[in-house]
Swiss-Prot record:
Stretches for region 7 X 4 AA repeats of C-C-X-P: 35-158
Keywords: Keratin, Repeat
Sequence repeats: 35-38, 41-44, 47-50, 116-119, 126-129, 145-148, 155-158
Underlying gene: KRTAP5-7
Protein's name in the database: Keratin-associated protein 5-7
TM region(s), chain numbering: none
Keyword Repeat: yes
Sequence similarity: Belongs to the KRTAP type 5 family.
Described function: In the hair cortex, hair keratin intermediate filaments are embedded in an interfilamentous matrix, consisting of hair keratin-associated protein (KRTAP), which are essential for the formation of a rigid and resistant hair shaft through their extensive disulfide bond cross-linking with abundant cysteine residues of hair keratins. The matrix proteins include the high-sulfur and high-glycine-tyrosine keratins.
GO cellular component: cytosol; intermediate filament
Length: 165
């Protein structure tokens, strides 16, 4: 009954689910044979089929996390190998999202993994777009900036820019 086995009557809708499945099998969480269909892979930990039509997620009886923002089908999921993990909360839409999310509960003292769906950060608001990757400059920063906050008075408020040492 695994999502990636393609042996439960998936037929032609399997779309190459077999060898590209990675470790999805046992972590399917009850997706059943429906997960072998490219347009129905809505469980957070079962997305190793070639594509998932975001518009069809509702009918799959599950949730795919960032599916709403992908604006189409997600391709190449099988090559990512494995389950989506906590990446659903990041709202990501890239293939790299199918690796464990790097900042689901904050980075702490360590930086994020390169497999994170969004740029790295070192705050609790991880996995959001970086606001000041090239320094403060004249533009204001967002509170969700991935870089460490500045302490310089010249920084915008809320201060969140990469400070020059």
């Amino acid at each position: 009954m695994g999502c990636c086995g393609c042996s439960e009557g998936c037929g032609s809708g399997c779309g190459g689910c077999g060898s590209g499945c990675g470790g999805c099998g046992s972590g399917c969480g009850g997706c059943g044979s429906s997960c072998c269909v490219p347009v129905c892979c809505c469980k957070p930990v079962c997305c190793c089929v070639p594509a998932c039509s975001c518009s069809s997620c509702g009918s799959c009886g599950g949730s795919k996390g960032g599916c709403g923002s992908c604006g189409g089908s997600k391709g190449g999921c099988g090559s990512c190998g494995g389950s989506k993990g906590g990446c659903g909360s990041c709202g990501c839409s890239q293939c790299s999202c199918y690796k464990p999310c790097c900042c689901s509960s904050g980075c702490g003292s360590s930086c994020c993994q390169s497999s994170c769906c969004k740029p790295c950060c070192c705050q609790s608001s991880c996995c959001k777009p970086c606001c000041c990757s090239s320094g403060c400059g004249s533009s204001c920063c967002q509170s969700s900036c991935c870089n460490p906050c500045c302490s310089q008075s010249s920084c915008c408020v809320p201060v969140c820019c990469q400070c020059k040492i």
